[in-house]
Structure formats: structure tokens, C-alpha cells
């Protein structure tokens, strides 16, 4: 009975209801609340009423007297129902319409002459209450309108603009009413009409009706006058009054004036009228673009239309133009519409909008925003309008309505005119037809707006002006100007700006509309031109109105050509920049391809790359760019950040197609850096901002806006999960990651940076080898190259002793000098470990292991190009296993130093954390650090602690760590320039999945050293020690079975201590002079102050030392502060505390002062002044007070002081022959006895039983089949096992 496919815009749901007639004085459909909920109806939504007749469309309201148990009954006014062909009790099908067009203009006709007369009498009442009676209209509908409580009239809907099956009346909709007179032959209308279907009526009563031909609007608070409904007010009854009601009269009948113009100027006026009558210009809003249309690019068109005030209008699909396009020229008025941000700035300055207009400015319905007359600027410009592709503009109406676009097409305005009118690029303007009859000026006045050359006179200016008029206007296409114009004339090979003023003889008439004048070369001959040579007062230079982006484009950046092409492809499809995109995605919602996310490390060039994409989109797609610097918003209140984002999104929607750039989005909508901050205020604010951003994007998707979104972030995972989640709205569907550049890309970046900074080609520097520099700049990013080039330029200027860049010559040596001491940004926050200054010659034994490491790591690092051509996959992971102390960690450091790569050492437990996800994040961060520092060696020590077999951990932490390691070691991306080394003594505990090919695929066994290897180890370790002639390392190697490399090193350390103790203490002391068992510890000896209060402070001669023992100068005993730490090493930290922590000079006065009565020469240093008059005393740690020294103690102390003297003199370079003959190091030579003594007290770290266990364990690890053939293991109840 009812067709479900009658309207493409109808919704899918519906309901069958019974019609009931009421006496309600409106045209609404009254529905019960239950039915409203069932149909999911929205306010002001249209409803299709389908019956046996043609479907109709009505607006609805909720009936107040319905109860919840009411049946499906829809009530409607009796007169409305009868006109729609319905009867009470009929069943109809209701279906909600998903898309309702806001009407800009509606043409209606009273059904009879009586209705027209009643309408004239109640015009004011109708303009106040019309929207309370009807909201949804459709062509050919006949509806009743109540003018009071008892009286109603019928009107018929003729046409809607824009053309649609149905539409909604708004507060700013123009309503054009055709008069209905009683004259029998009143239907004789001419064929001419404008684009809105306006017709002309001639009759006896036309002048009588002119009093009511007033331009009214549906809202009485507005002060605007619709420019499209103006007419010549020279009719009886006075001037037109502004209101919101548009009565259709003789809009385009430029009828005879009360005082007609003479024959002078009749050709120009006739051409103007003919042009306006033949063309059917479209009234609407257009977007200002920067690309010239074909009418402005062609030579012939430019000569006629491009000389003065001319606007070129063309449809969105300008690619469909022919080689020689056709265009139509009319005259019109252009006025700028304020954007939401400009309205907000205007309101801040004190200009308050009416309440309802504020609501419209906040409404998401862009149609209401675009047609809001209060947003128009007060000053309109009269100009020529060149319509390119007029038929395409008419046909584009349906396309633009389906996408809910703000603008019907594009308009190009010359820069001079655009800046004079203060219209920025990508602004929105309204163009309306010029319907007033132009006047003939009686005189013209020219006055320069700037100083003219002294030799310029009035006749010169008149001649130039006459030539300008002849080029800009013809008789058939006259020049239309307003009362005040600005023109540019060529004076003395330069353009000078003049002010052109017109004077009309009939100035006594006060006209509401703006008077325009017609001008041509013929008329100029009869018009007096007055020239004033005195310049006008120059206005202040206005600020730049256009938003300027950085000049860097994608072509000027190096190393990102592939990423740039992919990103631009995405943005082009998102903004429907190609015909195929328009055909495939025209009916898809906004953000068609999703947003673009650009990620990369610090200094990788994310912001520069994103701005270059925006620049490319602005140049090629004519897109508006709105940039939001999230770094500047960081730390501000949530409301301020949301407001900044809303302003950017609203501006982008107003000026669409647009691109929004959210730079450093992770700073305001990111994840906390550590799990402890998940509930911090910053994390809560980031979560709320992420949800708010999602809501804004959903709104753009629902409205179908032509807006593309670009965001930058360090990592995709650093954004809030709601923005990158796979569920819900897919915000970022394209992710471009800026990887560290390879050598070829580094060369391109260097080339582009040098070219951008110096403005010259790289061929001007023959001594500059960029490929050589690129090889030395591993791990450099874009910012590093910028700084490096600056340093190289500084080095070159310093070398040439010049400050001028014109004579600058860059060479490879300048860059090499700039690289010295320069640390790239990627390595500044990376905790790199500098390996010890060791080489392969410092390692004894392990020849096979060393060769494997050289072939796997060192050679590929030194010759990367050679190994890159090999047809095999290079190994990047090696596991070193063996007993403790066999040199696994030492090998990792040596191979890092020999290969010249960066070295990152990780101890296993430092990656583990109690927070869920923190351990996996720590693993990811380690590999990110390694990638940033590549070429790099990533060394995991104690690998079994972080990668045990899965299934043995109750918490599951290590299981997740193993899974993360598997992903990082052999993921989809793979490791480039990162070698992974792992060391363990228990390879059987490591998860076997990590040891499979592609991960740690090479397991290298580091065995305990045999006798030959032990001899090599002893030889290498003893190179830095002083060995006596009797040392036999071969014998030591033979008697140190089961010793590892670490044990042999400890053995040599112990032997060195034995030699030191044997030299310090006499052989006659008990236990070999062991300082640990004797009270003769050097650290316990102090020199007491003579004024310390002790009774023994001035001991007698028996307790004193021999004077020859202390025959040292003051400079020898107490050196300066920089070398005083050596003295504290022997006398302990208590030495200063006993003396009050004094300075060296104070110490000398306290420790070595003596009464003047004692003056004796020291035999050991004849000729020296005495330094001591009191004898040192000795205090043991277990005793209180002081104790006299024995002869043996004096001898020991004498030997120790001799050693101190020798060490100090050897360090200070003094002659050591005074008190100690021979070199000092001979006293510390390690003898065979020392080695044997140390060997007696040293045992291997791995016992014999433990060695057998390790050997069996490693044998089973190397031969898994042998382990399987062994007897089965007995498992106890509850024991956890793994199948790995």
C-alpha cells in the first residue's frame, strides 16, 4: 500500500497510525509519546506521511492529552488533512526523514484574491506567528495559515530554494509571495525572471500594492536588509522599510523612473538591464580560494574582467572545465560572512549578538550558520561576477546538500580587492544579484592615496584614468562602481592607488539602498573629472590577513619522499581532491579515510614533516590549515584546552575543505609515563581530553565535513587508548613513522639542509663529500643535521676569517671538525655504557669464541655495505653461556669496543616491575633506546633471570617479558643495526623459544680454561704487574686446575697484596707482620697535638723517635691540598679529626710544631732546620690514652715513612736518591713465593663437584637428544612443568 522507496532521504523505521482530525490551529502532526520514542524522532525532524495519495511531509509535536495506553493515533487539523486528501479514520504509514534541508528561500502564492487581501492586512501578525504554525513545507502543498483566532487563509508552496523534495523553514528563510489580484487578465506575466523564479506583475492595482511590497523577515530583532530583494523605491508611498517578509513584486523590472534618464547613457543602462535579465545568477555563499579559474587565467578574459572589481565564481569540480571555458558576466554585491572565531572576537570587543543568533552560532547545523544574515559585514562591495560553468553550479546544488556543505562553490577575488575588503583567504562570502538601477554620475573626483612624483600633473592623471576606463569597460559591458572606490593607475612605471568618488545631481533623495553608478569610455567624455594632487591621509598599514605557513615543502625536505607521497595520498582522498574520490566517497561521512598520525622520536622532524604536508595540501588542494600547538596548551586548565580545540574545529568546518594539525598531541592526551601516575590529575585530564576529542571527531563524521586531521606523537602507544583503540571509532587509520634515516636518506637530508640554509646548490662546494659525512652520522636525526650544518658553517667562517656567507665554502673537513664532541639528540637520554679500554689482546684463551664474535658482529659493523650484498640473513643474536668467571661479560665489552658500536648493558632484574605492563614497557623502551643508538650492542647479563621458561612464574610477569622479548627479537619490523648479546650460566633455564632461529640463534660455549689458556690468561693479566725474575707462570698454570679466568685474576691480586705486606712489615714480626692481627695498623697511628692535654704529649727521650727518622721537609710531609689525600690514605681519616679538620697549614702547626728551646740538626738531612721537638706517641684501637713505642715499632714506622717519601717524590718528580735509592716499584715485585703463598690461601670459585655438574648440564644442553634418552625424571605431586 505504501512504497518504502519513495524518498531516498527517509529513515528505515516506521509505524502505521490512524488519522484523527482536531481543531488545532497549526499544521503539525500531533503524536503520542510512546510513538515518538518508537520512531526515535528528533526535534524539528520531518515525517513522511504515506497513504494512497502522493506522500506528504509534515512536522510533528508531542500531543499532551495522550496517555501511555493510547493506540497509534496521529491527530491533525481538519483543514490540513482535507487539503492533503485524508479523512478521519484513515490509516497512514509514518516514516521519519533522516535529512532535512534548511530552506533559504520559499516562494508561495495565495490560493485566492481574498487570501491575498487578508494577507496584506495581517502581514505583521503573520511574521510573528508563522513558525508557530508550520515548519515543514514541500512543493505544491496547500496549507492553511491562521491570521487570528477565527480567520485563516490558504497558501500554496510554489518552489523551494535550494531545490529539495521538502524543507524546513528557519528564522532566516526568505518568503517570496506572489500577489493575487482580482483583475481578470492579471496572469499575463513576462517570461523574464531571476534565479529564484521571481515574476513580474503589471496591472491597474500594482502601484496600490507597492506600499506592501516590503522586505520583511521572520525575526523582528534583526537589522539586516536582504540585498536580493531591494528595488527602486521611486514609487508612491515612500521608501522601503526593513523587515523579514519578502513580497514578490517587480524585482527585476527596471521600470521607468519618475524622472527618466535622458538618452545620454541609455546604451550602457540598456546593456546592464539586458545582462541582468538574460543571466540567472545564483545567490548563495561561496568559499574564497587562491586558485585562479579559467576566466581569470585566459588572456582575453583578463583584459576585460581582471582590471577592476571582479569576482570569479566556479563550481567545486573545476577539473571538468573545457580548455576554452564559457562564462557568464553579471553584476552583484559581495559581502563577507564572519567565521565563528571572528564572531567570538567581535563579541569580546563589546559587540553582542542577539540571543537567538548566539544560539545559531553554536548550533552544529552549518546551514543555519551560513545563512545567518547577522554575520554579514556592514559594507558590501559592488562588482562584476564572472560565473564559470553556470550549469554546473546549478547542478551542484543537490550534491552540496547531500554533503551538508556550507558553500555552493568557489570564488576567486583579486588580491588587491580582497585585501581592501579585509577578506582573508578561505573566507566565506555571500554574493547576491544587483537589482537596483545604476545611475549616471555627473562628475568624478580622483585623489591619490600616496605621494606622487613631482612632475605628475592633472592632465597626466586624466589621461591615464581615461586609458584605464577604456581597458576596463566597454559600452556593452560597462563598469559599475559604487560611490567610493579604490583604483590603481600606472603612473611613471609604477602602480599608484587612487580614490575615485562619484557625484550625482539628485543627491536630495535619501535612499536606503546603496547607490551604484555605471561608467564607460563614452560616458567619460561627458563627465567632468576633478583631480586633486594632494594625497589623502594614509591609513595605517593593516596587518597580514592571510595565514602563512612555513615555506618548507615536501620537495625541500630530504629523505621523506616515500612517506610524503603516502601521506599526501591519504589527505587527498580525505578531502575528495580527485574525481575518483568524489565518485566513490561522496556519500560517505566525514573524515573519510580517518586521521593521519605521524610518529617519531625527538628531533626526527615530525612537526616539520606535518607542516610540509599541510603546505602541500594548501597549495594543491586549496585547503585551509588550522594548527594547534599542544605543547603551548600543556599545563593549562581543561576548559581552556577544550575551548582551543573547539575553536580550531569550528574554524576548519567553516572554511572547509580544511586540515587540522594537532602538533605533539601526546602532551595533552597521552598516557602517563609510569604506572604510578595512572590516577594523577594530569592522567585524568588527558583521559577527559581524549574523550572530548573523540566527541568532536564524531560530530564531524556525522555532519560530513570536508576536514582532514593530522596529529603528531612520539609513539602510537603514547596516546590515550581511546584514540588508538581498535574498537569504537577508528580515529587514526593511517600511521606514518619516521624511522632513523639510512645512509642514503642522511645524504639527502644533508643536501636539503645545506640548500635551505645557504640558498645555493651543493655543486658549488666541490670539496664536500656528503656520502662520507653520512657514514659518520649514524643515529643522527633531522634536528642533529640542522645543528651540524650550523656548526660546519661556523667552522668554515672561522677558517676563512670571514663573516659573509656569500664567500662561504664548505668542505668535508669543516663537517669533521663539527662532528668532534657532538652528541646526537637520540643518544643524549640513552644510558650508554662505555666499555673498558680493552682489546682482543687483553683476553687470554677463548680463541674460537673470539673468532665467532668477530665474524658475527665486528666484521659486519666495519664493512656494512659488503655484508649487505650477501644473499644470506645476518645473525643479530648470540647467547654466551658457560660457568661463572669464564669471561662472558668481558667478551661483550671487548667486542663493542673493537667494533666501535654503542654499548647498552642490561642487568636482568632491573627490567622487572610489580606493576602490570611495566615490565613489558621496560623491554620495549630498552629496544627503542638501542634502535636510537644504532649501531648498537644490547647486552643482557644474567639472562636467565628475565627470560625463564614460561609457566613457572605464579605472577606471570616473566611470561609476559618473554613474550615481549620474542616480539622484539623476531618481530615484523626486525632489528636493524642492533646486535643482541646475552650471557648466562644456566642456559637450561632460558625459555627454548628464545633460542630458536631468528632470535638468539647462535649459542656460544665459553669453557673453563685449560692449562694453555690459563697460561695465556696469566700472561695477559700480569703485563701490568711487576714480576720478579723467579716467577714461573707455566708452573702456576699447571697447579691451578679448575681455576677460571676470574680466579686467576684474584690469585694475582692476592699475590700483589702479599708482596705489599712483605715489603711493609719486617720479617721478624709474628705471622709475617700481618697487620690484621697486630696493633701496628697504619690507620691507627696518629700524631697528637702538644696541647691536647695528655700527660704524655711531651714524652722523654726514651719514648722519642730518632731525629733522623723525621728528616723531612714540611713540603715533603704535608703537600698541598690537591695531593693531601695520599697522606690521609696512610694515616686514616681519624688523623684530621684528631686535629680538628684543619687546613694543611693548620695541621703543620699542630702536628709538627716544637718549642724554640730545642734546636738540633737532623742527621738524615744536614743543614735543615729541626721540625720536631716532641716525639710521636702511639695509641692502639683497643687502648685509651697513649703508649710509648718500642724499638721494633720505631723500625717499622721508619720503613713506612720511607715508603711515603718515595711515593710522594715519584709522583712529584723529585729526586728519589736522597733517602731511597733505586726505583720504588722494585720494592713491590711479585715473586714466585708470593704467588705460591697466595695460591695456598686461594681456592677456585667452582668446586670439582660443581664443575662436573656444569659440564653435564652443558653437555645435555648441547645434545638435547641425549638428554631425552636418559631415564625419565620423577615428578612429585603439584610440581609445575612446561612443554617448551
UniProtKB/Swiss-Prot annotation:
Effect of changing residue 135 to A: reported as:
Loss of phospholipid-binding
Q: Name one GO biological process term.
A: protein unfolding
Q: Which coarse location class describes where this protein primarily resides? A: cytoplasm
Q: Which GO terms describe its cellular component?
A: cytosol; peroxisomal membrane; peroxisome
Q: Positions modified as Phosphoserine?
A: 1182, 1210, 1212
Which Gene3D superfamilies does the UniProt entry name for this protein? 1.10.8.60, 2.40.40.20, 3.10.330.10, P-loop containing nucleotide triphosphate hydrolases (3.40.50.300)
* Molecular-function GO term, any one: protein transporter activity
Q: Where in the cell is it found?
A: Cytoplasm, Cytosol; Peroxisome membrane
Tell me the segments the record calls region Disordered. 339-373, 1261-1284
The catalysed reaction is:
ATP + H2O = ADP + phosphate + H(+)
User: In what ranges is there compositional bias, type Basic and acidic residues?
Assistant: 343-373
Positions with a binding annotation for ATP: 600-607, 882-889
Q: What is its EC number?
A: 3.6.4.-
- Keywords associated with the record: ATP-binding, Cytoplasm, Hydrolase, Lipid-binding, Membrane, Nucleotide-binding, Peroxisome, Peroxisome biogenesis, Peroxisome biogenesis disorder, Phosphoprotein, Protein transport, Repeat, Transport
- Where are the compositionally biased (Polar residues) regions? 1270-1284
Statement: the UniProt record of this protein carries the keyword Zinc-finger: no
Superkingdom to which the source organism belongs:
Eukaryota
Extract the SUPFAM superfamilies matched here.
ADC-like, Cdc48 domain 2-like, P-loop containing nucleoside triphosphate hydrolases
Q: Which PANTHER family match?
A: AAA-FAMILY ATPASE, PEROXISOMAL ATPASE PEX1
What the entry says about domains is: The N-terminal domain shows evolutionary conservation with that of VCP, and is able to bind phospholipids with a preference for phosphatidylinositol monophosphates.
The text of the family note is:
Belongs to the AAA ATPase family.
Q: How does it assemble?
A: Homooligomer; homooligomerizes in the cytosol, interaction with PEX6 promotes dissociation of the homooligomer. Interacts with PEX6; forming the PEX1-PEX6 AAA ATPase complex, which is composed of a heterohexamer formed by a trimer of PEX1-PEX6 dimers. Interacts indirectly with PEX26, via its interaction with PEX6.
- This chain belongs to which protein, by name? Peroxisomal ATPase PEX1
Give the organism, scientific name.
Answer: Mus musculus
**Taxonomy-wise, where does this protein's organism fall, top ranks first?**
Eukaryota, Metazoa, Chordata, Craniata, Vertebrata
